């Protein structure tokens, strides 16, 4: 279908958008105003780690009812769409070509499945080829349709940073997955974090920020120690003033390993816990 700004189906999220397209072509649906949405973008030539994290974040967000927006490119975009579908959620692909063209062809399955559980969206008419100049343009629509933008992996001059810039101009929150210093695929994300982007440590963290699903700081009736209200307090209480090995902290906290590690990292960043040597922690005095 074709919709214009005068159409009642036109996304309110696009109102006031700088360079608003004169129309949109849609196969399937567009996000409604009540729908919580996250854009997950990143490198086409991503690492195995990037693929895994894009899929993981998208799947968990989708399971919690958050729809995933991306660009159906190879790499991070494709894995984000696939993760959302695997999580039983909705996903939307903003294309840099006409609706009648599947680009890249390797994503044919996504091209066919996404309209059944979301939609394909483009400002380019049928027959429009996937020209290089189209992709930076479509990025402004990706960010505009999202409540929050997550960059998973990006080089220093990645197109994903264009999406992040658009998001900031539009007043959206931007988060990035941290990576190893010196890793080319992490330079863009680490740069965003250095410039003030949020640190994406887990899907649960982003769900809490978006007010969707169970957040990190919600209390858990099963995992309480001395009446502690949150998992964060629980983990902190398991760290002593003397060095303590990780396996002992895990045993006492009785939380999933990845959750405990995530909270320990947060506590380190806050200056409340030190990793005195590998897998050994103590409270900072």
Residue ranges with predicted function:
Residues 2-285:
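Glycine-biased, small-residue-rich flexible motifs in mid-sequence functional cores and linkers
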């Amino acid at each position: 279908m074709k919709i214009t700004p005068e159409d009642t189906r036109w996304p309110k999220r696009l109102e006031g958008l700088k360079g608003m397209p004169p129309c949109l072509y849609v196969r399937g649906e567009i996000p409604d105003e009540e729908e919580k949405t996250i854009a997950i973008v990143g490198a086409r030539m991503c690492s195995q780690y990037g693929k895994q994290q894009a899929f993981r974040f998208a799947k968990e967000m989708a399971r919690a009812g958050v729809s995933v927006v991306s660009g159906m490119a190879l790499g991070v975009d494709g894995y984000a769409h696939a993760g959302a579908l695997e999580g039983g959620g909705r996903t939307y692909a903003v294309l840099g070509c006409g609706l009648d063209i599947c680009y890249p062809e390797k994503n044919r399955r996504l091209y066919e499945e996404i309209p059944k559980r979301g939609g394909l969206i483009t400002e380019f008419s049928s027959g429009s080829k996937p020209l290089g100049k189209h992709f930076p343009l479509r990025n402004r629509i990706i960010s505009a349709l999202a409540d929050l933008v997550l960059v998973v992996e990006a080089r220093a001059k990645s197109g994903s940073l264009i999406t992040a810039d658009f998001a900031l101009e539009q007043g959206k929150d931007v988060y990035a997955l941290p990576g190893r210093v010196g890793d080319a695929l992490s330079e863009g994300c680490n740069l965003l974090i250095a410039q003030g982007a949020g640190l994406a440590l887990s899907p649960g963290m982003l769900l809490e920020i978006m007010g969707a699903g169970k957040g990190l700081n919600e209390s858990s009736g099963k995992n309480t120690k001395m009446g502690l209200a949150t998992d964060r307090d629980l983990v902190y209480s398991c760290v002593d003033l003397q060095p303590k090995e990780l396996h002992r902290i895990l045993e006492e906290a009785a939380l999933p390993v990845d959750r405990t590690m995530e909270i320990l990292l947060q506590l380190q960043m806050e200056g409340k816990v030190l990793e005195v040597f590998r897998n050994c922690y103590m409270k900072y005095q």
